[in-house]
Amino acid sequence: MTQIGMMLAIMALGVPMSAQWPAKTPGIPRTADGKPRLSAPAPRRPDGKPDFSGLWEHLNARTSAYYLKDIAFPWQPSAKALFEERKANNQKDNPEGQCLPRGLPKADAFDIHKIVQTPELIVVLYEYGTTFRQIFIDGRALPTDANPSWMGYSVGHWEGDTLVVESNGFNGKAWLSFEGVPISDALHLTERMRRRDFGHMDIELTIDDPKAYTKPWTTELHPELVPDTELIEFVCNENERDARHLVGK
């Protein structure tokens, strides 16, 4: 299988489509003809904080590594060598080819996901693999010995209307892109999240991973609200047809 063919197979495997739902999403501002007015002001919770709740996706999420475009990675030599090895081997060890989680921040960049916000906790539900993430906003500190996992351990605090989320405790197995840009278990991820208006969010990501990169670097995500639909169940192993073909060179 060629590298391009294998990449297309993984992307088809890993990007489910959201369902057309029989009912309109309540609480969304609409025009006179019933269309969602996504430029309306961002909603707020009773305490005045921005409310990130809703179903979100990136319009260009089905292209490969768009959020890493034009970044000059400050590679550690070992991470650069690992990246080149993955490319040379046609990305055959991509975790998604084995129906494993995407991890962060790739899941936020590529998956349609639902944010459920409460005063002390934000839960993110991802359609791909029916995975989830918790962001604790109850004032707790980021632990120094979190149990290693695909999605890490996340705590958040408010700086005005910006939610600042700090995450660690990653297992280092996830890829940042389909091409194989690596992270390690030393990753410290910082996300600065703003809901610009009702239908648009801006997220600044800072990747601080001294095992993989010589200095921190940043990129951005700009998800859009997906109205009038809901998540559907997506069980990767029930649909998986491609892992047997991911044999590399």
Model regions: which residues?
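PEST-like low-complexity, intrinsically disordered acidic/proline/serine-rich tracts
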Residues: 2-3, 9-10, 15-249
